[in-house]
Amino acid sequence: MNKKAAVLCLDAGQTGVRACIDIPKPDGGEERIDLPEKPGVKNSHPLIPQLIERTHDAFRMFSSYQNEPMNIGKDTTIGSICVGSSGLSKDCRAEDFLDGVSDMGISEVFLAHDSVTGYLAALGHERYGAVVSAGTGVVTRGVGPHLTKRVDGWGWMIGNAGAASWMGKLALEAAMRAYDGRGPQTRLTKVAEEHFGRLDKIYLKLYSDDQSTKHLGSMAEDVTRLAGEDAVAFEICSKASKELAISAYTALRKADVDKYADIAVSGRGSVFNSRFISDHFTMYIHSMVPHAAIIDPIGDPLSGARQLGYIEPDNPLHSLIAHAIK
């Protein structure tokens, strides 16, 4: 990686793509400049073209910042890109990505699934453990000295247990059960109406909406807010906390580090902004792995993406990073 050139980092999720530019400073450090968030990637579409488009968006913003308002020097160039993305699979070739962005003078790219960059963001590359990244969706990554394991991240229809969209889906189900008389009355009925309108019309909106996952996830904050006042909301949040803890424990076990004395577990993402979720997650983790240290993330996903170029070959995560250079 060219240490004299700036590095563009992308955190590409389904609800938004965040970007920053790390500019080298004379003292050997870096200055980070965050760029405006752009629309998220769609897992139903080819990923590489979407990442190329978002890179061009970031490059145009970078060019405008070389004047006002950031006054970045005109001699500053971007030499490499580090990307953590939802939906990244083995058929997403770093070479294809590099071909699509080389017109901007970029000569090196690193690509990884966002479970990898999420892990690096929370625990770095020198500590073993598990990281649960829970926002609209959820994916968990466990890392040991020899193995790494991904858990969940399979989308709102068949996975994402404990994620915001998962909680929103359960909240809608509870509201519809109450509406029909199949379940108890709940304050989540009002939440559903505030987000989607008339209950008897929700299904028409939901099934024709290509942003349904995002809109389901938008209910989660209200669900967690009501956990102390509504029995149904309490049950949903308790289940979510336990599912997230089960994913973390499974990742530790599959990475063969659950018996290690010095392991860490970290939860990151908007779901963990809820005190109810974070406290119950910790409780469930300690019931499964009493010796695990629960720690706050040391960085954010963009800082995790920035580390992709520094992962040593003997780290299990190294094999999950696609790299191309000209």
Name the predicted role of every residue range.
Residues 88-186, 322-326:
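Phosphate-binding/catalytic loop of phosphoryl-transfer enzymes
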Residues 1-64, 70-79, 100, 121-130, ...:
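ATP-binding/phosphotransfer module of carbohydrate and carboxylate kinases, centering on a glycine-rich
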